[in-house]
Amino acid sequence: MDKKEFEKEIKKCFKNVNQKFFDQIETYKLFLQEKNEQFNLTNLSDEKIVYAKYFYESLIPYSEIDFSNCKNVLDIGSGSGIPGILLKLIHPNIKLQIIEATGKKLEFMKQLVQKLGLDGVI
Protein backbone atom coordinates (compact mmCIF):
# COMPACT_ATOMS: atom_id res chain seq x y z
CA MET A 1 0.00 0.00 0.00
CA ASP A 2 1.58 3.27 -1.07
CA LYS A 3 0.88 6.73 0.35
CA LYS A 4 -1.96 7.51 -2.09
CA GLU A 5 -3.69 4.18 -1.43
CA PHE A 6 -3.33 4.74 2.31
CA GLU A 7 -4.91 8.19 2.09
CA LYS A 8 -7.77 6.92 -0.07
CA GLU A 9 -8.61 4.04 2.28
CA ILE A 10 -8.30 6.12 5.45
CA LYS A 11 -10.68 8.74 4.03
CA LYS A 12 -13.24 5.98 3.45
CA CYS A 13 -13.04 4.76 7.04
CA PHE A 14 -12.53 7.99 8.97
CA LYS A 15 -14.72 10.84 7.78
CA ASN A 16 -13.07 13.44 10.02
CA VAL A 17 -9.52 13.19 8.62
CA ASN A 18 -8.07 16.23 6.90
CA GLN A 19 -4.83 17.25 5.23
CA LYS A 20 -3.25 18.09 8.60
CA PHE A 21 -3.67 14.44 9.61
CA PHE A 22 -1.88 13.23 6.47
CA ASP A 23 0.89 15.81 6.92
CA GLN A 24 1.39 14.59 10.50
CA ILE A 25 1.42 10.97 9.31
CA GLU A 26 4.19 11.83 6.84
CA THR A 27 6.16 13.58 9.60
CA TYR A 28 5.59 10.54 11.86
CA LYS A 29 6.77 8.11 9.15
CA LEU A 30 9.92 10.08 8.38
CA PHE A 31 10.78 10.50 12.08
CA LEU A 32 10.13 6.80 12.70
CA GLN A 33 12.45 5.84 9.85
CA GLU A 34 15.10 8.33 10.98
CA LYS A 35 15.12 7.19 14.61
CA ASN A 36 14.44 3.48 14.09
CA GLU A 37 18.02 2.28 14.36
CA GLN A 38 18.79 4.46 17.38
CA PHE A 39 15.71 3.34 19.31
CA ASN A 40 15.22 -0.18 17.83
CA LEU A 41 11.52 0.47 17.29
CA THR A 42 10.32 -1.75 14.48
CA ASN A 43 11.12 -3.20 11.05
CA LEU A 44 10.87 -0.43 8.46
CA SER A 45 12.39 -2.09 5.41
CA ASP A 46 9.78 -0.86 2.92
CA GLU A 47 7.67 2.31 2.83
CA LYS A 48 4.65 0.34 1.59
CA ILE A 49 4.91 -1.89 4.64
CA VAL A 50 4.93 1.17 6.92
CA TYR A 51 1.72 2.49 5.37
CA ALA A 52 -0.01 -0.90 5.20
CA LYS A 53 1.10 -2.76 8.31
CA TYR A 54 1.96 -0.06 10.81
CA PHE A 55 -0.48 2.69 9.96
CA TYR A 56 -3.46 1.27 8.06
CA GLU A 57 -3.80 -2.08 9.84
CA SER A 58 -3.32 -0.39 13.20
CA LEU A 59 -6.10 2.14 12.56
CA ILE A 60 -8.77 0.03 10.86
CA PRO A 61 -9.94 -1.81 14.01
CA TYR A 62 -10.82 1.60 15.49
CA SER A 63 -12.79 2.86 12.49
CA GLU A 64 -16.11 1.58 13.86
CA ILE A 65 -15.66 3.03 17.34
CA ASP A 66 -17.37 6.31 18.15
CA PHE A 67 -14.78 8.47 19.89
CA SER A 68 -17.07 11.51 20.17
CA ASN A 69 -17.74 10.85 23.87
CA CYS A 70 -14.28 9.48 24.61
CA LYS A 71 -12.09 11.76 26.65
CA ASN A 72 -9.19 9.46 27.55
CA VAL A 73 -7.27 6.74 25.73
CA LEU A 74 -4.66 4.56 27.42
CA ASP A 75 -1.97 2.96 25.25
CA ILE A 76 -0.08 0.30 27.21
CA GLY A 77 3.22 -0.80 25.71
CA SER A 78 3.10 1.94 23.13
CA GLY A 79 6.53 1.20 21.64
CA SER A 80 6.71 3.38 18.55
CA GLY A 81 3.35 5.01 19.30
CA ILE A 82 1.03 2.62 17.55
CA PRO A 83 -1.92 2.77 17.91
CA GLY A 84 -2.03 5.57 20.50
CA ILE A 85 -0.39 8.36 18.51
CA LEU A 86 -2.38 7.40 15.40
CA LEU A 87 -5.62 7.66 17.36
CA LYS A 88 -4.54 11.01 18.79
CA LEU A 89 -3.87 12.30 15.27
CA ILE A 90 -7.32 11.25 14.06
CA HIS A 91 -9.09 12.33 17.27
CA PRO A 92 -7.08 15.35 18.49
CA ASN A 93 -9.53 16.08 21.33
CA ILE A 94 -8.77 12.89 23.24
CA LYS A 95 -6.28 12.86 26.10
CA LEU A 96 -3.72 10.14 25.38
CA GLN A 97 -1.93 8.39 28.23
CA ILE A 98 1.09 6.33 27.21
CA ILE A 99 2.68 3.59 29.28
CA GLU A 100 6.01 2.31 27.99
CA ALA A 101 8.51 0.37 30.11
CA THR A 102 11.49 0.68 27.76
CA GLY A 103 13.33 3.92 28.40
CA LYS A 104 14.62 4.44 24.87
CA LYS A 105 11.15 3.90 23.39
CA LEU A 106 9.69 6.33 25.91
CA GLU A 107 12.34 8.87 24.88
CA PHE A 108 11.36 8.35 21.24
CA MET A 109 7.72 8.96 22.15
CA LYS A 110 8.60 12.21 23.93
CA GLN A 111 10.50 13.43 20.88
CA LEU A 112 7.69 12.34 18.54
CA VAL A 113 4.99 14.11 20.55
CA GLN A 114 7.07 17.29 20.46
CA LYS A 115 7.81 16.95 16.73
CA LEU A 116 4.11 16.48 15.93
CA GLY A 117 3.12 19.37 18.21
CA LEU A 118 0.62 17.27 20.15
CA ASP A 119 -1.10 18.48 23.30
CA GLY A 120 -2.86 16.24 25.79
CA VAL A 121 -0.33 13.40 25.72
CA ILE A 122 1.01 12.11 29.03
Predicted features, each with a name:
Residues 2:
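Interfaces and regulatory segments of ATP-dependent nucleotide/adenylate/phosphodiester-chemistry enzymes
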Residues 75-79:
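Conserved S-adenosyl-L-methionine
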Residues 80-93:
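Conserved SAM-binding loop of SAM-dependent methyltransferases across substrates and taxa
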Residues 95-101:
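Conserved SAM-binding motif I beta-strand of class I
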Residues 105-107:
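Short alpha-helix immediately C-terminal to the canonical SAM-binding loop
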